[in-house]
């Protein structure tokens, strides 16, 4: 008798009670936090960063702005001083507005329990924790979306946590909270679209805006792009589409409303600042290519694609740098397999390809770059939304990994060769 080939099914997530049960159910989620935590701590140890040596991570804006602001906040928390006004910056400053951009990481409030001389070490470990959280949240997203519970969650979680954006901009601690929350915003968005559940969406989006409203803007744009992509792939008539618009709009407004007590002071505070490059570009121009034409765009695309390679050193603070988008060779090869898999519909391939393509083009065309960054051009550190490209690629790679059994060895080899040829 000929035996029928068994279909591969996702690993069932058992729900066991008690502490041991919780640990057993979430073993790979825990590992997705612990392993990056250990690796980042070891890396700082090898680099002899304090407390492991005499070096420190206080560079550029972290040294000139974030560290002094955090030291001031620590003093205010310890001595019960006002969080609405400060006399330590210039002739006085609206401290509430300053906090809304620079100091709203939940970890910062833990400094009230620390001696002031430990602040540098605190900042180092806060980076470690945020990288570990990014990996863990990515693992949670992948497990919930694909119903798989094995060590692959750790691997792909780390692909996001150790992506070039984190490694290049680790010193920009005020951004990292919102970036590491991105998988939870995406998971909340998925649950809102597919199940009508709104709690995670509201809480995660509100936290993204609260921890840093500037990077939170990218989360809002990503929700919009996800909404468009989902409704194209899962089109179910105009009535369902209208319902989705209404539901997403209402819950998004609730999330924004929950943070209004911080966003409004920040908005009014921004009216008193000088913005960099606040004029919308009226003529076609590109950021990366050498000429403002089709050939320049193609040149820019080639350069950006080359930056997917893992061993390309990430940009740290160069204004003319390429976007930090590398997230591992595995993600890159599996990302190619995503487009060759027969198990994935053509519509899904086109939509996901267009999503990544749009974000890449947004790095090139100055008008799109201007819109992404809140109708401004950035002052150093370009393409601040580029972490979303890494996020989407890792998700696509995991989708292809789930269907790897349907791909032949030659498919994998050809995908790797294609990556080497194009990049």
Q: Predicted regions span which residues?
A:
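Start-transfer (signal-anchor) and selected internal transmembrane alpha helices
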Residues: 1-47, 247
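Membrane-interface junctions at the ends of membrane-embedded or membrane-associated helices
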Residues: 15-21, 145-148, 190-200, 230-243, ...
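Transmembrane signal-anchor helices characteristic of membrane glycosylation enzymes that use polyprenol
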Residues: 27-62, 251-268, 357-361
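Membrane-embedded helix bundles of polyisoprenyl
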Residues: 36, 128-144, 151-233, 247-267, ...
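Active-site lumenal/periplasmic loops and adjacent helix-entry segments of GT-C-fold
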Residues: 43-146, 150-183, 207, 211, ...
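Membrane-helix boundary/interfacial segments in multi-pass membrane proteins
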Residues: 56-57, 166-176, 319, 357-410, ...
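Periplasmic/ER-lumenal interhelical loops and adjacent helix-loop junctions
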Residues: 60, 64-75, 81, 106, ...
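Membrane-embedded alpha-helical segments of multi-pass membrane proteins
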Residues: 125-133, 176-184, 220, 326-333, ...
């Amino acid at each position: 008798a000929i035996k029928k080939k068994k279909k591969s099914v996702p690993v069932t997530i058992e729900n066991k009670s008690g502490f041991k049960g919780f640990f057993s159910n979430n073993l790979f989620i825990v590992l997705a936090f612990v392993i990056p935590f250990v690796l980042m701590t070891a890396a700082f140890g090898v680099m002899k960063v304090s407390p492991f040596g005499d070096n420190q991570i206080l560079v550029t804006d972290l040294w000139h702005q974030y560290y002094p602001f955090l030291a001031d906040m620590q003093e205010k928390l310890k001595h019960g001083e006002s969080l609405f006004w400060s006399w330590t910056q210039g002739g006085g400053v609206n401290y509430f507005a300053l906090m809304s951009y620079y100091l709203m990481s939940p970890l910062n409030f833990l400094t009230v329990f620390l001696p002031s001389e430990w602040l540098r070490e605190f900042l180092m470990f806060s980076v470690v924790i945020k990288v570990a959280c990014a990996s863990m949240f990515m693992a949670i997203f992948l497990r919930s979306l694909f119903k798989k519970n094995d060590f692959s969650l750790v691997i792909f979680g780390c692909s996001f946590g150790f992506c070039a954006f984190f490694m290049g901009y680790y010193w920009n601690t005020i951004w990292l909270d919102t970036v590491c929350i991105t998988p939870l915003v995406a998971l909340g968005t998925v649950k809102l679209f597919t199940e009508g559940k709104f709690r995670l969406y509201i809480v995660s989006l509100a936290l993204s805006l609260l921890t840093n409203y500037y990077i939170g803007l990218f989360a809002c744009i990503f929700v919009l792009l996800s909404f468009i992509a989902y409704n194209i792939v899962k089109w179910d008539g105009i009535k369902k589409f209208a319902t989705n618009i209404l539901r997403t709009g209402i819950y998004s407004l609730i999330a924004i409303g929950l943070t209004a007590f911080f966003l409004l002071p920040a908005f009014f505070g921004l009216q008193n600042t000088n913005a960099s490059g606040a004029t919308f570009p009226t003529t076609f121009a590109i950021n990366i290519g050498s000429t403002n034409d089709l050939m320049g765009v193609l040149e820019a695309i080639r350069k950006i694609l080359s930056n997917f390679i893992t061993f390309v050193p990430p940009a740290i603070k160069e204004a003319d740098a390429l976007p930090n988008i590398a997230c591992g060779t595995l993600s890159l090869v599996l990302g190619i397999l995503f487009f060759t898999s027969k198990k994935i519909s053509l519509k899904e391939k086109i939509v996901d390809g267009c999503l990544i393509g749009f974000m890449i083009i947004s790095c090139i065309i100055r008008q799109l770059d201007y819109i992404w960054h809140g109708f401004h051009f950035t002052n150093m550190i370009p393409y601040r939304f580029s972490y979303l490209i890494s996020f989407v690629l890792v998700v696509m790679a995991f989708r292809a990994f789930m269907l790897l059994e349907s791909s032949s060895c030659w498919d994998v080899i050809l995908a790797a060769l294609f990556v080497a040829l194009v990049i």
